[in-house]
Design a protein with these regions (language model features):
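Patatin-like phospholipase
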Residues: 1, 5-226
Length: 226
């Protein structure tokens, strides 16, 4: 990790202290910018008491000592997006969303998704657990209400294989998900989501076995206006 004080550069080799924030504090830093690459070694807790901005990536950056041009290019792009996100210039957790897209996201996804999920759970309560299981990989990352509201769309996009490199508008991320996800596979869960369906124990049991596929169906159902 590189830690900067004024115009001088101090280098720590990692392993025993992957983010040497204490070193920066001892050098006289008054504010810290930390980059956590989730590398091999020990990451000590931040006990400096200094204002700290930490840049982290949701995505697996690959083996830290494997130097491949394609991986390096991808990681540089992700790092650029993560840094902008850390300073509030971009939204999203797994995907980089343009700032100012809140209204569009609420109209196209957040509100209709919440309505659909409430309706489905009222008929089949176990679906709440199924959705929770699908979103579990994002839990520790979603620390704000906005992040939690967007988590189903972002997780579904991840499961569909949408490229995280790139800055998306609300419509672009929704459309990228629709292009990548399997509509035919999602359709088998639609009976659970239709108002007239009633309680469907068989479909609910299947969804519990494949929560990611159920989440994909939920998101597709909303975005295609089924």
């Amino acid at each position: 990790s590189d830690v900067y004080k004024r115009q001088e550069e101090y280098i720590d080799g990692g392993w025993s202290d992957n983010m040497p924030l204490g070193l920066a504090a001892r050098m006289g830093a008054e504010e810290l910018l930390a980059v956590d690459v989730d590398g091999v070694g020990v990451t000590l807790p931040n006990l400096t008491g200094l204002p700290t901005t930490c840049v982290r990536s949701y995505w697996d950056l690959g083996p830290i000592l494997r130097f491949e041009p394609a991986t390096a290019k991808r990681n540089i792009a992700l790092g650029y997006q993560d840094c902008y996100r850390a300073f509030g210039r971009l939204a999203g957790t797994a995907y980089a969303l343009r700032a100012g897209e809140d209204k569009k996201l609420a109209e196209r996804f957040v509100r209709p998704y919440a309505r659909l999920l409430r309706s489905a759970i009222s008929r089949s309560p176990s679906l709440a657990l199924t959705e929770g299981a699908a979103l579990r990989p994002m839990e520790r990352w979603c620390t704000t209400e906005q992040a939690r509201a967007l988590a189903p769309l972002e997780r579904a996009a991840e499961l569909a294989g949408v490229d995280p490199v790139g800055i998306y508008t609300a419509d672009e991320l929704c459309d990228a998900f629709l292009q990548k996800s399997d509509g035919e596979a999602a359709a088998r869960f639609y009976p659970l989501l239709r108002q007239e369906a009633g309680w469907r124990p068989m479909e609910a049991a299947v969804s519990a076995a494949v929560p990611g596929e159920f989440l994909t169906a939920l998101v597709r159902f909303v975005l295609t206006g089924q």
